[in-house]
């Protein structure tokens, strides 16, 4: 248990760059003394170093800024989003996740469609506000500049009142074992609740997201209704999807 916690703590620090002791206490539900002991182990390993009030990653693997992530596999991401828009139907209530893949999904949406969109993405908010037939519902209390998303909710259970037909989700990584994962605790709360509530969950992910996982699993792989991606999946994914009636669409 202790070794697993230390490993997860290392992954969390590496993905976030710099974190406070208080944040680590909250995320891992342990005391400051326990966090300090775990940090000492990680500093001995050479993965992190102490800074005032917290720790920072020595390795340059912190969460990549939104602008840089947009550049990575940009053509693939745009094609995936444009393809996925065909699944949005008249009178749907859909959730559109934040992320560099989902952000272009409204570019090719038929403007005549009457759709209610629930989102925490600044890019989706901006795009939806230009479409006259869109009913827009914004969630999240605080704006996170690095991911261009609104995060945190006083009561995540408030999402339960929405009958969401389809959720178009992004992920930092996905595997059959760990499912759909991300690295941010505040984003995780929204993603998890939405994935549990939505009738159909669509994963929009370019080829680089498969076969890797990060700290937090917000949905198991078998929760998916459909995957929209850019390249054929490995045989293990294809077989699993066939066995669990998960659709695979190549953009």
UniProtKB/Swiss-Prot annotation:
It comes from Bacillus subtilis (strain 168). GO terms for biological process: regulation of DNA-templated transcription. Keywords: DNA-binding, Repressor, Transcription, Transcription regulation. The keyword Transcription regulation applies. Residues 19-38 bind DNA. InterPro entries: Carb_Metab_HTH_regulators, DeoR-like_C, DeoR_HTH, NagB/RpiA_transferase-like, Tscrpt_reg_HTH_DeoR_CS, WH-like_DNA-bd_sf, WH_DNA-bd_sf. Residues 1-57 form the HTH deoR-type domain. This is HTH-type transcriptional regulator IolR. SUPFAM superfamilies: NagB/RpiA/CoA transferase-like (SSF100950), Winged helix' DNA-binding domain (SSF46785).
